[in-house]
A protein has these predicted regions:
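An extracytoplasmic/periplasmic, membrane-proximal ligand-sensing/linker region
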Residues: 58-60, 160-202
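Substrate/cofactor-recognition hotspot
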Residues: 139
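Periplasmic-binding protein-like
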Residues: 31-36, 63-66, 72-73, 104-128, 142-166
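A ligand-binding cleft/hinge motif common to bilobed small-molecule-binding domains
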Residues: 89-107, 156
Length: 202
């Protein structure tokens, strides 16, 4: 899944929509931006951690975002629904959640940033010593099978298989524009990510 910029198509054209994280700092978006509180959503915590750890952004970026009137919602669904309802023109949003709402008729668009796209991995694995290891292996194999990956694509997620047709951006396209993120550092600094963000926004 990928974190980019979603927008209400009734209020913002594709041409007008922000194309970078820095575009959200433009005064024309003042008080028209929403994102999910990272203390309530792991995907947003990942996004915040990725930008905090990048010297191009860091804490200063979030200070500027706050100064431009970015508001917080308590959950991912609420963030997307608020943009769909027109309460905000743009939001820091997830591609698959946005696309699911588009499929339901919501007036939304989504920008895959050409650089510094925050791509979030969704790993699967077996817990060592689990009670039903054989069943776990069957599920693991099914998820990675062509049929299993086609189900993910039907739900607007990306497949890791080359023989499954994607609905939107390809894995190769996303890889080219994705930000490099140190996953171990994010895990090690999870509490610090939230405390730094909260010191700016709350």
């Amino acid at each position: 899944m990928n974190m980019g910029i979603g927008y209400n198509t009734g209020l913002v054209t594709e041409e007008e929509a922000p194309k970078s994280w820095d575009d959200l700092l433009d005064p024309k978006w003042e008080n028209q931006i929403v994102m999910t509180d990272p203390s309530t959503a792991g995907t947003t915590k990942y996004f915040v951690g990725a930008l905090l750890s990048d010297s191009k952004y860091g804490e200063d970026y979030f200070k500027k975002l706050k100064e431009n009137g970015c508001e917080l919602e308590s959950g991912t669904t609420a963030t997307h629904n608020q943009v769909a309802a027109g309460a905000y023109k743009v939001g820091i949003m997830l591609d698959y959640v946005t696309q699911n709402l588009i499929d339901e008729g919501s007036p939304l668009g989504f920008t895959y940033l050409p650089s510094d796209l925050v791509s979030i991995f969704s790993p699967i694995g077996l817990v060592e010593g689990c009670a039903n290891e054989d069943n776990g292996k069957l599920l693991y194999d099914f998820i990675l099978s062509k049929e299993g990956q086609e189900i993910l694509v039907e739900n607007n997620l990306l497949s890791v298989r080359n023989d499954v047709e994607q609905k939107g951006e390809s894995v190769d396209e996303i890889t080219k524009s994705a930000m490099t993120v140190d996953l171990q550092s994010l895990a090690d600094n999870s509490d610090e990510i939230i405390s730094t963000f909260d010191s700016v926004f709350k």
